[in-house]
Amino acid sequence: VGCGASGSSGSASSAAKKDYTQILHDARSDEDNEYEMIFTKGEDGKFTAQYGYSAEYEADQLSDEVANMMMPLLGLEDDMYDDFAASVSGMMVRVYGVAIVKPAEGKTQDVVDAMDAYVQSQQKSMEHYLEDQYQIASAARVATVPTGEVVMVCCEDSDTVFENIKKALAA
């Protein structure tokens, strides 16, 4: 009985952990999956990524790129989250960012503030530069969903992508 109980509690906890990378992948367009990698933090504390151009990197290079380029864009500090998956465009001519963040205890507002700051910086950089990209940034959404995650969607068709993510998180 002890083995069965420990086995079932193990599977219950793994069932509770959601695959944020897969949820983002399924919520967005095929084109975004082709061009924009989705990154997260691996068990070993290094950043990993799938999709987009992630296959072009060696593991350490990829982890460094995410740590030095992508995470500062999002404004997420290590102590702010328990888990996350995100995808942002590093191109200055394209507004693109999606993220699912499971905040650390007591850090929900910090995560919301970081996501809001990302969206505001995208709006500001595009306001007098590329009107179509400014419209995308202006339609961005940051919200804490009923399951507790903070979701940021700053991309084309943001309402649909947001609803797809919200539904998948609730499943």
Regions found by a protein language model. Give the residues of each.
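Early exported N-terminus immediately downstream of N-terminal targeting peptides
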Residues: 15-71
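Short, compositionally biased low-complexity segments enriched in polar/charged residues
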Residues: 46-96, 110-111, 138-140
